[in-house]
Amino acid sequence: MGVRSPSSADSATIADDIAIIRSMHTEAINHDPAITFINTGTMQLGKASLGAWLSYGLGSETENFPAYMVMLSQGTGKNPGQPIYSRLWGSGFLPSEHQGVLLRAGADPVLYLDNPPGVKRSQRRGQLDDLARLNQAFAQQTGDPETLARIQAYEMSYRMQASVPDLTDLSKEPDSTFDLYGPESRKPGTYAANCLMARRLVERGVRCVQLFHRGWDQHIALQSQLPRQCQDTDQPSAALILDCLLYTSPSPRDCKT
């Protein structure tokens, strides 16, 4: 029958539509190797993450975003919680184009996306074309696949200069959407806001969206800390699944994560 918790009442309503992995275990006694194992299949560094494998195996459905994107949030249950490292969404030995790209809250959602000061978009296009020719020549000379991945990264950044502002503009989202995800969804960087952003990424064709929410390491004060942490995630998680299911097919909001 399972254990029921009032702290996850909304999540209980979508339990039939989510996958919970109960078979995974590790001999690691510390958080870092354990979470590395969960995300990469090994406690050792240097292996590809789950999202990178999905990108590598299934490819991308959009030219305007990476196939794998990641968002972080800090919970209210325990602050600051355990650290999160970028290797958890790394590509390991796979081509670097498959690593996750971090989407942040605020005015600069993706680092190093803007053109240098004083450089117009047309000038940037010319620079990238010249740079691509040089990189192509170097790739033919050395056979280094990372050189080709670098070209793809530059081109993706150029396209994202137009696609990211549209992604992060929530002005056309109705109030009913924010009501569905909860009041925290209006606050950039919260788990609720990231869930809403995850739906927007999925409907734009991003293959894998991964949300990390820190603050689950409750050793003490469970009665006060754990309910707050669950409150962060319960309604938004259920809303994300319901939002995807509501527009499954033939609508463009086809949830594939």
Residue ranges: model-predicted function:
Residues 256-257:
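N-terminal low-complexity segments that are often proline-rich with Ser/Thr-Pro
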